From Swiss-Prot:
It comes from the Eukaryota. Glycans are attached at residue 118. Residues 193-331 are cytoplasmic. Component of the death-induced signaling complex (DISC) composed of cell surface receptor FAS/CD95, adapter protein FADD and the CASP8 protease; recruitment of CASP8 to the complex is required for processing of CASP8 into the p18 and p10 subunits. Interacts directly (via DED domain) with NOL3 (via CARD domain); inhibits death-inducing signaling complex (DISC) assembly by inhibiting the increase in FAS-FADD binding induced by FAS activation. Binds DAXX. Interacts with HIPK3. Part of a complex containing HIPK3 and FADD. Binds RIPK1 and FAIM2. Interacts with BABAM2 and FEM1B. This is Tumor necrosis factor receptor superfamily member 6. It comes from Macaca fascicularis. Palmitoylated. Palmitoylation by ZDHHC7 prevents the lysosomal degradation of FAS regulating its expression at the plasma membrane.
Amino acid sequence: MLGIWTLLPLVLTSVVRLLSKCVNAQVTDISSKGFELRKIVTTIETQNLEGLHHEGQFCRNPCPPGERKARDCTVNEDEPDCVPCQEGKEYTDKGHFSSKCRRCRLCDEGHGLEVEINCTRTQNTKCRCKPNFFCNSAVCEHCDPCTKCEHGIIEECTLTSNTKCKEEDSRSDLPWLCLLLLLIPPIVYVVIKKACRKHRKENQGPHESTTLNPETAINLSDVDLSKYITTIAGAMTLSQVKDFVRKNGVSEAKIDEIKNDNVQDTAEQKVQLLRNWYQLHGKKDACDTLIKGLKTADLCTLAEKIHAVILKDITSDTENSNFRNEIQSLV
């Protein structure tokens, strides 16, 4: 009898454990079924938002594309009362149970779009990019303007790709550029040479156009320029005088000294600068140095004028001297 009372608690514990397992299994099964039910309900609700399933009473068939349900079915499995969508403004492209049509899409010109296919009751509007616009995405909500090329086009703009432009420093122009750079120096040289020759001819006096015979030939290398300094200074600007004397030995300190001594008289500055140069250089070859220096500074016209003045004066003196000599020989 004592053994029975000892085994009874063990039996009761085993029974409780078995009952607990059964209850847990049922709860788990119920939870799993509840989850599946919620999933089905969610799917139905989502589809109802698209109008693919029944609203209100269950109609037997959906409204065809291009129409909508005018009113709910009053009896389950009844045929729906469908009416057409508004042409050009609304559409439905599949069978449905909804009482509303979808609104047609608008092609916004401000976003570079235009209508490719108009909206019908069974098809939404189809948009495309306007001319000179493109869109390279799968769904085009807007189009971008095509790039305008300044230096030539490699590929034209299309509806799905932008223009491909040539670069500014295209290598195709390099040979022409090199040829141009090679031709410029000789052309400039010829132009300058012709200009100097033209000025020389325009300023040449009648006495210069004839060739002097050995008896009347004049050597300008030993001409005394002191009496021509004022005339030469009057034919030149102050900057021209400064450039000439600076390149021919007059120091900057001396140039500044002459400037400070004659601040208000630029004419006197030119005369003093040329006198100072002449004193430094000396009489011999001074005339040739002056003429060559002016030509080197691209002052061909000025050089020819000074040369003509000196030559005319010397020629006149020579003729007078010859005339006097002839008179004396006759006496």
